[in-house]
Structure formats: structure tokens, C-alpha cells
Amino acid sequence: PRAIVKKAFKPVNESIGDSIEFKLANESSQGSALDTTTFSSASLDYLMLSDVDPQVKCLAEAIYFEARGENVVGQYAVAEVILNRVDQNQFPNSVCKVVSEGASKLHSCQFSYNCDGKPEYINDLKSYKRILKLANMFYDGTARLLTGGATFYHSQDVSPSWTTKLKKTREIGRHIFYKIESRVALK
């Protein structure tokens, strides 16, 4: 199995309007303290970007096309699913490979924007830059506690047949999240 690296950021409140709140553990000589940090669309506008990893760009593109109409919480949830897949052996081991899996066949991909037969354009540059900052922040190892370990999701507007084989974990924004149900062997 792949090693999963989790930093000290932990979401503590998934919905504060258009924001997500995190507790950050700070180590000091007196022990560890928890500081609360809240990220919203507005606060993301003020973050600066340096050189961006190509994997972060793939993550941002997927968030943009799959969840740009969602608030920060919904966008984070989609990012979490993609990163959860990267950590699982049954999926490709990079963000770019995860989001492009099956893209060569019409309607056979994992992320519909990649194989719906329509060209994709980033028309809202302000939203894309904000999403790129969000992707950069979460790619660096933020703990993924929002979706209950989900590796699948779909819009509430559809009812795909593949959901019957999965365990529903959460509904966030306009998406429903699922994970592969663990099976326990009986002796």
C-alpha cells in the first residue's frame, strides 16, 4: 500500500457559508496548541502562488470543471476524492493519471469533463486562479476528513448504476460521495 502523508490541517467545520475552517496544530515547548484557520473564496484571493506543480494544475483543472459552481467546501470535497484515489492501489498513482483515466473513450472516463465530447475552456480566470490556490494548498497533504474516505462521487442530477456497489458516505453541495465498502472475512 502507498504511504499516506497527512499534515496537521484538519477540517473542523465543513460549512461556514462559503468557507471551510481548519485547526492547525502548532508544536511549541509548552506542547501543541490548536489555531483555527478559515479559508473562504475571499481569503483564497489573497494567497500568492509561486511555481505550481503540474499535478496541482491537473487537480485545479478537475476542480474547475467538476465543481466550480460549488462553494469552497464542495470544491475541497472533489479534490479530496481525487487525492484519496491517488493513495489507493486500485487507481493510478498521480493526480494527472487519476483525472485522465479513461479519457480516450467517449463517456468512459472517471471524470465526465474529460470524455463528454465537448471542448473544455477555462472562461472564468478569477475562479480558476482561486481554485488553483485551493488545489495547491490541499495537494501538500491536508488531512482528508470531509468525505469519509470517498473515492467516487456524482452530481445529484444523475443516478448512475455503479452506486449500488458502493457505500454512500456524504452529500456535500450538489454532489453525493461514495467509497468501496470494506468486506470482513468470516472464519
Predicted ranges, named:
Residues 1-187:
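Bacterial extracytoplasmic/cell-wall-associated proteins, especially those involved in peptidoglycan
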